[in-house]
């Protein structure tokens, strides 16, 4: 009798303690949940690519420290997304091993981005030359990643009405813009053309094709990003 009563009490306590998490998750739409899980892995993709390219080119020039510096920032972005997943009781899709992804598209994309081939078949309109073809190609890979992140983050912002989620996304967007500025500076602002921000395949209602590169890069003196 005592054992049965104990089990009942324990079950009630478990349900009571768990209810807030399930309630928070239930408050999100399926698309919001999908955005959160995708964004967590997309930030991991950026982090893992930059770490891999830094290790590959390490010692090749001082400009390559950009990959290590931005990888550190991407880790903060990953942590911020993990915080949102935990807040809403959503399972974390990110594997701890570098270069391993639950999302099959991101897995294939990672392979292209860090390859030494000049003839990759694009997965998401990325450059056909992988980041290990040369330093310039690696910089273009970095810039492409940040452009891709910006598009996906803007889509995710338009897809939620929750202030906490939108706030994290806005910080991520600020960070991606800062990272894009850094890569464009290495490539030469006068020589760089956006790779997908103006692409008709990627432009949505929140992205206007006539907007300039300067618009996307923003003014770094006005921004403090995580």
Task: Please name every model-derived segment.
Residues 9-16:
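Bacterial N-terminal signal peptides
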Residues 25-226:
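All-alpha RGS (Regulator of G-protein Signaling) helical domain and cognate RGS-like helical scaffolds
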């Amino acid at each position: 009798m005592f054992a049965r009563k104990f089990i009942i009490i324990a079950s009630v306590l478990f349900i009571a303690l768990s209810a807030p998490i399930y309630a928070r998750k239930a408050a999100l739409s399926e698309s919001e949940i999908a955005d959160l899980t995708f964004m967590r892995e997309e930030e991991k993709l950026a982090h893992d690519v930059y770490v891999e390219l830094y290790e590959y080119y390490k010692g090749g020039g001082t400009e390559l420290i950009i990959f290590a510096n931005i990888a550190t920032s991407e880790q903060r972005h990953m942590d911020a997304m993990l915080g949102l997943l935990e807040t809403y009781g959503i399972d974390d899709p990110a594997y701890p091993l570098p270069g391993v992804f639950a999302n099959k598209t991101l897995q294939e994309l990672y392979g292209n981005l860090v390859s030494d081939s000049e003839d990759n078949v694009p997965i998401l309109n990325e450059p056909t030359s992988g980041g290990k073809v040369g330093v310039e190609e690696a910089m273009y890979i970095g810039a492409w990643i940040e452009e891709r992140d910006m598009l996906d983050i803007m889509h995710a912002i338009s897809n939620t009405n929750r202030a906490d989620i939108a706030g994290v996304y806005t910080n991520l967007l600020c960070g991606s813009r800062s990272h894009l500025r850094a890569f464009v500076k290495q490539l030469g602002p006068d020589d760089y053309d956006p790779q997908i921000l103006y692409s008709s395949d990627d432009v949505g209602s929140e992205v206007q094709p006539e907007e300039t590169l300067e618009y996307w890069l923003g003014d770094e003196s006005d921004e403090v990003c995580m």
